UniProtKB/Swiss-Prot annotation:
Its job: Probable oxidase that may be involved in pollen tube growth.
Name the record gives this protein: L-ascorbate oxidase homolog
Domain Plastocyanin-like per the UniProt entry, residue ranges: 25-145, 158-301, 345-524
Taxonomic lineage of the native organism: Eukaryota, Viridiplantae, Streptophyta, Embryophyta, Tracheophyta
Origin species: Brassica napus
Family: Belongs to the multicopper oxidase family.
One GO term describing the cellular component: extracellular region
Alphabetical list of Gene3D superfamilies matching this protein: Cupredoxins - blue copper proteins
Length: 555
């Protein structure tokens, strides 16, 4: 009898342990060694940034709510940080990887990132935010799959491929940084790469991907480049757009897609053509001279080379604007949760604040700078979030140095200083990006997705709201603004933290075209924001200061 009771007790404890194990989301551990290495993206050997010896870096394959733990060892000769472009880090900007939220990983040291793609699915990527490292590599794909119990609005593909497209410079990241520090532009890129390579286009390239005839494939396309919008297309194949930066979209077929810097598209491609080789084509947009590269797709068992006749890309930005207007949120599909995306009626929420952000460029002390509303951001030695957390904000930066509706005089006179907006928690805000320049801009917001309700030519006025898409605009994290145009986005600032609003044009970001949105919880509650992790790095004015004891407490 005693043995039976003991067995029953053991079974009970085992069952309890099983419950505990399954109650917590899975953990996935990675160790990354960041080093310099040599590669030939454009056919000429040059220094690049490798992760575990790879260029591009490893793909992160995760599922909604997974705990992703990455121990990053910096073996470069410079400070280093990675950001996870599009991951929202709910209540946890401590892992965002921007200079305003984290101290850099110093040479010869390491830091362990721990983040969750909480209630997210979709196609993303990571890249370095320090200096001009992005121009040397250090980037890679990041996919977040739906949980098994959540229905997906398309059949399971045969395989899942990540296509990282971007412009490329033959000059090193240190040379490019010297140009910018000296007040010069880095100019136009030398080429385009697909997954770190530029195809010869003569049929001699090794295939990047292999397809089985008749099968469908998930193809995720991200523009990880420095500054250039890129059009992507596949010979003789249509791409069915199914997802965009974490949102399921209405499924339309496209011959080509304009992918602006920082953006990601999830497509379905069917191998329904004659079994042979086909070219993927990536070409620059909005440059006087078009730069093109190719990557090879090979049908399994296929015979015959790819045709040398490449499909032509579109011309002008009006075509691109029309394509943007064709993107629609799939209101009936479920994203990371069982409820349909369309159950959130953003168009019925009252706007509580309108912020207009006007991008400009000019010279300060004879050197090129880029600005928002007349302020060109500079990173203080003490990260903004640390200054805020340790209660020394007044020693590091001032809030709201720009106005929500800048005058022409304010825009014209550029000042260099930290640019931090104070945003009230849980307010529904309209942000208008106004582009008076001749180049296409690409804007990203960390910590959130927003509804891109309009992109139109001209100057924004309140009357333009009548043209907003208040029903099925796509919820995303990066939006383009065409020359002499404006873009409007809507969102609820419900994720506490210090969040970067930046130009995805690396040259512009480095020279000041960015700001931070500070969203603080009035209750200082753990329900709204996590305390600074014990493992967080400290630098600047708080380098040797003890961490505050649980400033965020309560439910």
């Amino acid at each position: 009898m005693r043995g039976v009771k003991l067995l029953a007790a053991c079974l009970y404890l085992a069952a309890a342990a099983t419950v505990v194990v399954h109650a917590e989301d899975p953990y996935f551990h990675h160790v990354w060694n960041v080093t310099y290495g040599t590669a030939s993206p454009l056919g000429v050997p040059q220094q690049v940034i490798l992760i575990n010896g790879q260029f591009p870096g490893p793909n992160i394959n995760s599922t909604s709510n997974n705990n992703v733990i990455i121990n990053v060892f910096n073996n470069l000769d410079e400070p280093f940080l990675l950001t996870w472009n599009g991951i929202q880090h709910r209540k946890n900007c401590w892992q965002d990887g921007t200079p305003g939220t984290m101290c850099p990983i110093m040479p010869g040291t390491n830091y362990t990132y721990h983040f969750q793609p909480k209630d997210q699915i979709g196609s993303y990527f990571y890249y370095p935010t320090t200096g001009m490292h992005r121009a040397a590599g250090g980037y890679g794909g990041l996919r977040v799959n739906s949980r098994l119990l959540i229905p997906v609005p398309y059949a399971d593909p045969e395989d899942d491929y990540t296509v990282l497209i971007g412009d490329w410079y033959t000059k090193s990241h240190t040379q490019l940084k010297k140009f910018l520090d000296g007040g010069r532009t880095i100019g136009r890129p030398d080429g385009i790469v697909i997954n770190g390579k530029s195809g010869k286009g003569d049929g001699s390239d090794a295939p990047l991907f292999t397809l089985k005839p008749g099968k469908t494939y998930r193809v995720r396309i991200c523009n990880v480049g420095v500054k250039t919008s890129i059009n992507f297309r596949i010979q003789n194949h249509k791409m069915k757009l199914v997802e965009m930066e974490g949102s399921h979209v209405l499924q339309n077929d496209y011959d080509s897609l304009d992918v602006h810097v920082g953006q990601c598209f999830g497509t379905i491609v069917t191998a329904n053509q004659e079994p042979k080789d086909y070219y993927m084509v990536a070409s620059s947009r909005f440059l006087k001279t078009v730069i093109t590269t190719t990557g090879l797709l090979r049908y399994e068992g296929g015979k015959g080379p790819a045709s040398s006749q490449l499909p032509a890309g579109p011309v002008g930005w009006a075509w691109s604007l029309n394509q943007f207007r064709s993107f629609r949120w799939n209101l009936t599909a479920s994203a990371a949760r069982p409820n349909p995306q369309g159950s959130y009626h953003y168009g019925k929420i009252n706007i509580t604040r309108t912020i207009k952000l006007v991008n400009t460029q000019g010279k300060v002390d004879g050197k090129l700078r880029f600005a928002l509303n007349g302020v060109s951001h500079t990173e203080p030695e003490t990260p903004l979030k640390l200054a805020e957390y340790f209660g020394i904000s007044d020693k590091v930066f001032k809030y709201d140095t720009i106005t929500d509706d800048p005058t022409p005089e304010q825009i014209k006179n550029i000042k260099i200083e930290p640019n931090v907006l104070n945003i009230t928690h849980r307010t529904f805000v309209e942000v208008v990006f106004e582009n008076h320049e001749k180049s296409v801009q690409s804007w990203h917001l960390d910590g959130y997705s927003f509804f891109s309700v309009a992109v139109e030519p001209g100057t924004w006025t309140p009357e333009k709201r009548k043209n907003y898409n208040l029903l099925d605009a796509v919820s995303r994290h990066t939006v383009q603004v065409y020359p002499k145009c404006w873009a409007a986005i809507l969102l609820t600032f419900d994720n506490c933290g210090m969040w970067n609003v930046r130009s995805e044009n690396t040259e512009r970001r480095y020279l000041g075209q960015q700001l931070y949105a500070s969203v603080l919880s009035p209750e200082k509650s753990l329900r709204d924001e996590y305390n600074m992790p014990e493992t967080s790095l400290q630098c600047g004015l708080v380098k040797n200061t003890p961490k505050p004891v649980n400033p965020y407490a309560g439910a």
